[in-house]
A protein has these predicted regions:
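Hydrophobic ligand-binding cavity/cleft-lining segments
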Residues: 1-45
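Exposed loop/turn and edge beta-strand positions of beta-sandwich/beta-sheet ligand-binding modules
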Residues: 7, 11, 76, 107, ...
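A short small-residue
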Residues: 10, 124-131
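Generic alpha-helical structural signal
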Residues: 18, 79, 145-149
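Hydrophobic pocket/interface hotspot
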Residues: 24, 34, 59, 82, ...
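Residues at helix-coil transition
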Residues: 29-30, 39, 87, 149, ...
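Hydrophobic-ligand binding "helix-grip"
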Residues: 35-36, 43, 49-50, 54, ...
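A conserved amphipathic terminal alpha-helix motif
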Residues: 84, 128-158
Length: 158
């Protein structure tokens, strides 16, 4: 019988934006905006992006890994289920990641938008279970850090 392993990890990423919570929240809620910062990315080509932003709604992205990645030609799929949405305050979602046809993780993520004098503090908390040699918490935190860099660029757009 094949032995199955799981590694658990939690990380928190905090960012400050010179934008209102309404604008930062919109970058998560509007499919066109989210696709620009979330679904794009260096080293892969987006093949699928579907988003239904509502409690009970789902999101699915699939990108094909490029030749300079450790898994050239392999699909990386994100399947998301929206658990809780409070406009301009928080989004809670559960998501799984697949590499090819192998599920590599399942996570619960909470994004909080806190109004400040200078704009918005975003607090991203990820609680994950990483399966059999999956990417693990450190790599996932690095991936989300890169995604939030993309969010910074999206929020700088006019």
């Amino acid at each position: 019988m094949e032995e199955r392993s799981v590694t658990h990890g939690t990380f928190v990423i905090e960012r400050s934006y010179p934008n209102t919570p309404e604008r930062v929240f919109a970058a998560f809620a509007d499919p066109g905006k989210k696709r620009r910062w979330f679904a794009g990315g260096e080293g892969s080509e987006m093949e699928e992006f579907e988003m239904n932003f509502r409690v009970g709604g789902t999101e699915r992205t699939m990108r094909r890994m490029g030749p300079a990645t450790p898994f050239p030609g392999v699909a990386l799929t994100n399947e998301t289920y929206y658990e809780d949405i409070v406009p301009n305050r928080r989004v809670v979602f559960a998501y799984t990641m697949l590499l090819g046809d192998r599920r590599i993780s399942a996570s619960l993520a909470t994004v909080e938008f806190v109004r400040t004098e200078k704009g918005t503090d975003l607090i991203f908390t990820d609680q994950g279970a990483y399966f059999e040699s999956g990417d693990g918490p450190k790599m996932r935190e690095g991936g989300w850090s890169k995604l939030l860099e993309g969010l910074t660029k999206e929020l700088a757009r006019p």
